[in-house]
């Protein structure tokens, strides 16, 4: 029932030239445990398994420190903004980048003898996270299953054949994978300078790779390894084939192959890992040729040798979530058949929407536990994926975790917190370097998972002045506490344990409160009374001014509203971005709430200071259409021809529109203006559509949410696995999980809105989607929706709630009559 089913497959051919809109590995099925993952083509004769480790990044010669001149540029930036000088260009700065996520080794399983294949099907079991393939080879049944064990932290593939088969197992050249050695604009990529060797030790085939050596890189002596242990009831022998001349970073003369014959059972156990201490780059070749051992390889071999192969896949966390729509059912149609059917249907097909929902839940769970999802989730089947498959924090990570807490994905929440904790030291340094702040945080647009220093900025994308990031990253942690209450989490991550000196963290005391204090400190320090708006709302600069007068407000200067700039203005470095205003208000309110909760010594005075700061912040402004302005500056014109909607932060992720009807109406109008004025190529980036739908759901605009989802399901964004591209027209050929995971957040928001005092049922559910039922949603007031049923014809709703210890919650439904509220305690 809960599965992704396809009758098609795409064989991944080595050294293949493919069309950017039709990439074979994009059609692979996926599995993961948050740290390790796998892409499997499921091709019957030549299957490919591409292994993943979420921490794999390719070092480069890009600097790993904040530019030293950024501190001195702050006054220049402020003066350029206050004087409306859009020619200041950060001294022609060239943006540098984080390290790029890369795939691990790829195993190729080849059935010998060119058998006749029939009865083919493949599917992913969402309940157990298992990729399954079944077919007949010369009339004999063959089944394959692959899953990633959370308990043992390995990838296990089992092949069972009704009759004995012959199979060869080999590791593909890294160079044979798409885009090896080539970055955007055909710039040579750093992996051209890596070195690798393949080997066989008994029944283990593997590879060890030394990263290229760059001065200042923490991975100058690093590398990665991957090994696959093979168990079979057949015969096994080792052969070799000449190395392909195109495998120029491979130091071997031949490539090993394991040949299996007369086998009815074959099991593969794979583990892959990295290190920053593989030894000197210049010694790697001699060590391999001298049969020297590498501690990393030994670690990997010991891991696969210790595995209990009798372990069965276990049910995943999302098993408690259930969505059923009338007219929606898991019919026998394959994914590609449903997508084709949808193209010929005007309205959204409920059974497709159900499948997309479960697919998103599955993908989120597969990425959960170690970190947050990358741009491509956990998976990559090529080198130099566009945007380096980074963790992008100006919408993409945020969108992908939007349904995390409401879906009750506890492991996803803990992984998100590990993701945040790894970055905080760099965030503190960013705030110190860019603004000269103490004990504050400034979030970059991207992290590669290892570092989060402020390097990715230039005049077109001045992210050094993106001020709202920490507030945005804080919200899911705040929601985690609202959802689950106080909790203690434990990690086995050596780097985290070394960084913080412990392995156990109280979510409130060790994660949320320290980060909130640092985020508040940022807003406390950014205000400079020399830069302000006067009583008439005009932007002013007064050298030496030490305090604000009554009715004056701080300018948030400089400011950046990702990734837009005012109409007719040539610089994105501005002041008073609505996103900044909203984030600042949100953080200050969270901070005062925390103070009133903890009641530490002197908290009353601290609350008074925070409330005073809140009054000194700029207010939102509104344009002639009534829309909230992207910049609260009289001097800037609106620019609605843009995919990003950063100025709608008050609606989502914040909750500020829920009790402010004027602001809510202004945000609704802002969406209308964007829809009207931003059409064409810029409107194909899926994150813009998903972001918009999340905002529309919070604004309780059911028809608008439905229309956005309808556009999505009629686009070309979905692969046959139901995972997604970055663009609705696949024009960039980028595997991206924004839409796949973001859909879960959207549907949850359509079904239930909640805050600490309120549960609203079906706030943005369109009647066009019909009646249905959902179980297991979590709320921000700590209550679980055991079951919610609704009937769009009768306009009645039934809900059963698990109240727990929570009291004084108001349950409302604007468009339906609540027929019954069931209570469980």
Regions found by a protein language model. Give the residues of each.
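Glycine- and aromatic-rich loop/turn segments at beta-sheet edges
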Residues: 371-385, 431-434, 528-560, 624-632, ...
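Extended, hydrophobic/aromatic-rich amphipathic alpha-helical segments that build helical scaffolds
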Residues: 353-367, 470-479, 514-523
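Active-site core of glycosidic bond-cleaving carbohydrate-active enzymes
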Residues: 46, 65, 393-396, 405-429, ...
């Amino acid at each position: 029932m809960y599965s992704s089913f396809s009758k098609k497959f795409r064989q991944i051919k080595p050294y293949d030239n493919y069309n950017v809109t039709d990439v074979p590995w994009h059609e692979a099925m996926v599995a993961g445990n948050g740290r390790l993952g796998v892409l499997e083509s499921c091709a019957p004769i030549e299957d490919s398994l591409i292994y993943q480790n979420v921490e794999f990044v390719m070092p480069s010669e890009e600097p790993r420190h904040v530019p030293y001149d950024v501190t001195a540029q702050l006054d220049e930036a402020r003066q350029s903004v206050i004087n409306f000088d859009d020619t200041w260009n950060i001294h022609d700065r060239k943006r540098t980048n984080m390290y790029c996520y890369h795939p691990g080794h790829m195993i190729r399983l080849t059935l010998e003898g060119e058998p006749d294949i029939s009865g083919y099907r493949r599917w992913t079991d969402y309940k157990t996270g298992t990729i399954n393939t079944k077919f007949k080879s010369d009339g004999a049944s063959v089944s394959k299953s692959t899953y990633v064990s959370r308990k043992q932290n390995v990838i296990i593939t089992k092949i069972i054949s009704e009759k004995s088969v012959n199979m060869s197992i080999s590791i593909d050249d890294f160079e044979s994978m798409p885009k090896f050695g080539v970055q955007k604009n055909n710039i040579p990529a750093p992996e051209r300078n890596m070195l690798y060797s393949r080997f066989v030790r008994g029944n283990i085939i593997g590879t060890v790779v030394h990263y290229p050596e760059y001065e200042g890189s923490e991975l100058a002596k690093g590398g990665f390894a991957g090994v696959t242990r093979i168990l079979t009831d057949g015969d096994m022998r080792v052969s070799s084939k000449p190395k392909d001349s195109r495998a120029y970073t491979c130091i071997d003369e031949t490539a090993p192959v394991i040949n299996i014959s007369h086998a009815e059972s074959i099991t593969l156990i794979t583990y892959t890992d990295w290190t920053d201490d593989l030894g000197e780059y210049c010694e790697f070749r001699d060590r391999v040729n001298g049969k020297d051992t590498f501690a990393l390889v030994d670690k990997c071999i010991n891991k696969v040798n210790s595995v209990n192969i009798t372990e069965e896949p276990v049910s995943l966390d999302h098993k408690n979530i259930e969505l059923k729509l009338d007219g929606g059912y898991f019919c026998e149609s394959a994914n590609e058949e449903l997508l084709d059917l949808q193209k010929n249907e005007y309205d959204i097909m409920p059974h497709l929407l159900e499948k997309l929902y479960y697919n998103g839940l599955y993908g989120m769970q597969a990425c959960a536990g170690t970190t947050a999802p990358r741009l491509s989730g956990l998976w990559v089947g090529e080198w130099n994926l566009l945007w380096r498959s980074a963790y992008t924090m100006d919408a993409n990570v945020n969108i992908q975790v939007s349904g995390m807490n409401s879906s009750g994905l506890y492991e996803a929440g803990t992984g998100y917190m590990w993701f945040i904790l790894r970055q905080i030291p760099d965030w503190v340094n960013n705030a110190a370097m860019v603004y000269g702040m103490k004990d504050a945080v400034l979030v970059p647009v991207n992290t590669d998972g290892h570092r989060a220093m402020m390097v990715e900025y230039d005049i077109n994308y001045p992210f050094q002045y993106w001020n709202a990031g920490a507030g945005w990253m804080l919200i899911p942690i705040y929601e985690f506490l609202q959802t689950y209450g106080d909790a203690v989490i434990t990690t086995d991550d050596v780097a985290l344990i070394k960084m913080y000196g412990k392995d156990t963290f109280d979510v409130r005391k060790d994660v949320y409160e320290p980060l909130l204090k640092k985020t508040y400190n940022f807003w406390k320090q950014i205000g400079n009374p020399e830069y302000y708006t006067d009583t008439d709302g005009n932007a002013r600069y007064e050298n030496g001014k030490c305090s604000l007068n009554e009715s004056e407000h701080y300018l948030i200067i400089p400011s950046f509203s990702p990734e837009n700039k005012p109409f007719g203005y040539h610089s994105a470095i501005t002041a008073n971005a609505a996103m900044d205003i909203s984030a600042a208000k949100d953080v200050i309110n969270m901070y005062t709430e925390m103070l009133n909760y903890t009641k530490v010594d002197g908290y009353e005075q601290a609350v008074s200071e925070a409330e005073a700061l809140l009054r000194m912040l700029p207010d939102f402004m509104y344009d002639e259409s009534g829309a909230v302005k992207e910049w609260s500056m009289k001097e800037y014109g609106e620019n609605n021809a843009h995919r990003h909607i950063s100025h709608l932060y008050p609606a989502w992720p914040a909750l500020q529109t829920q009790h402010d009807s004027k602001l809510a109406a202004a945000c609704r109008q802002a969406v209308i203006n964007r829809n009207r004025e931003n059409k064409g190529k810029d409107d194909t980036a899926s994150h813009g559509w998903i972001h918009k739908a999340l905002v529309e759901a919070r604004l309780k605009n059911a028809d608008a949410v439905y229309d956005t989802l309808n556009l999505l399901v009629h686009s070309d964004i979905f692969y046959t696995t139901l995972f997604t591209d970055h663009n609705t027209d696949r024009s960039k050929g980028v595997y991206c999980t924004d839409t796949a995971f973001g859909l879960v957040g959207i549907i949850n928001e359509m079904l239930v809105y909640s805050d600490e005092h309120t549960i609203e049922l079906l706030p943005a559910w369109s009647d066009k989607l019909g009646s249905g039922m959902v179980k297991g949603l979590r709320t921000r007031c700590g209550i679980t929706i055991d079951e919610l049923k609704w009937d769009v014809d009768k306009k009645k709703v039934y809900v059963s709630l698990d109240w727990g210890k929570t009291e004084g919650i108001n349950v409302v439904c604007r468009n339906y009559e609540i027929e019954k509220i069931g209570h469980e305690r």
